[in-house]
């Protein structure tokens, strides 16, 4: 019987952590078709988070001091994981009961399997489903196909949100960067490099988006911007075309973040360094007038 290790990092989340823990621990067919190992690493919470975690059947660890991001905890979890396959969860993710049992049949053949997911936007109350359609119920990606997609910062192709991934223990040797402590771009490139993968065409977890998400945090966006530029430089000799495309898209992402946060001066600055297309042109024009309408009606960022 296969064992699944789930690595969950936490910090000051006592209002939501019980629901997250229960959604992982109460998976369909657990102890019948697979074993489950839930590893929780807390980043020195000062609320009731740890108290709640310790009421559950989990392996618990804590960082020695607050690190300001999840990556140190993820690496601790990887070190202590003993499963055949590994998932990484965020503290505000909620798993559907059939998540593992839907992914497991494909894990033996493919080193990386992903799925679709639900997005619950707690800020603007606009919910959505991110899932691909395929008559077979899954989509196969050739060796290095998803690596190239990630390197180019393309939104097409396989879904690679961290919470959607289950991967083989053979890939646990790849660890997360701890200098910035929160960025996963280089880690995704490492695990998908020279690997084939599969995506299940089902939404199997809920990704909550709100003002506290790192993806909408200014400090995180700054770290992600500079670390992404540093990361793509390493691949320039082998993939020059893809790196040039990534550079433009990284600047475009930076521009849209400032657009979303109403800093239109910086938004214009970064739009001018991003891809030259109609979408960028209209975004740039709307920084002068119409941005509120755009933000209400389109998914600008995230």
Where is each model-derived feature located?
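A conserved acidic beta->alpha catalytic loop
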Residues: 23, 42-50, 67, 90
């Amino acid at each position: 019987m296969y064992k699944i290790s789930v690595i969950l990092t936490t910090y000051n989340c006592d209002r939501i952590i019980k629901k997250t823990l229960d959604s992982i621990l109460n998976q369909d067919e657990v102890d019948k078709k697979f074993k489950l190992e839930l590893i929780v690493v807390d980043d020195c919470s000062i609320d009731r988070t740890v108290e709640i975690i310790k009421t559950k059947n989990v392996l618990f660890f804590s960082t020695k001091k607050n690190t300001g991001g999840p990556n140190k905890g993820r690496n601790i979890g990887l070190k202590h994981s003993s499963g055949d396959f590994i998932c990484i969860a965020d503290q505000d993710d909620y798993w559907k009961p059939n998540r593992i049992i839907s992914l497991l049949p494909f894990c033996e053949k493919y080193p990386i399997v992903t799925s679709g997911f639900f997005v619950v936007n707690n800020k603007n109350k606009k919910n959505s489903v991110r899932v691909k359609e395929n008559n077979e119920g899954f989509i196969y990606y050739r060796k290095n196909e998803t690596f190239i997609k990630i390197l180019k910062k393309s939104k097409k192709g396989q879904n690679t949100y961290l919470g959607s991934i289950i991967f083989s223990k053979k890939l646990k040797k790849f660890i997360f960067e701890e200098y910035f402590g929160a960025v996963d771009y280089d880690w995704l490139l490492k695990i998908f490099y020279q690997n084939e993968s599969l995506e299940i065409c089902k939404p199997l977890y809920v990704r909550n988006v709100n003002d506290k998400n790192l993806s909408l945090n200014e400090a995180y966006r700054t770290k992600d911007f500079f670390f992404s530029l540093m990361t793509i430089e390493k691949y320039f000799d082998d993939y020059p075309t893809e790196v040039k495309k990534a550079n433009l898209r990284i600047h475009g992402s930076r521009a849209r973040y400032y657009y979303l946060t109403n800093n239109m001066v910086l938004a214009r600055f970064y739009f001018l360094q991003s891809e030259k297309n109609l979408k960028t042109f209209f975004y740039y024009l709307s920084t002068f007038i119409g941005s509120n309408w755009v933000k209400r009606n389109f998914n600008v960022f995230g």
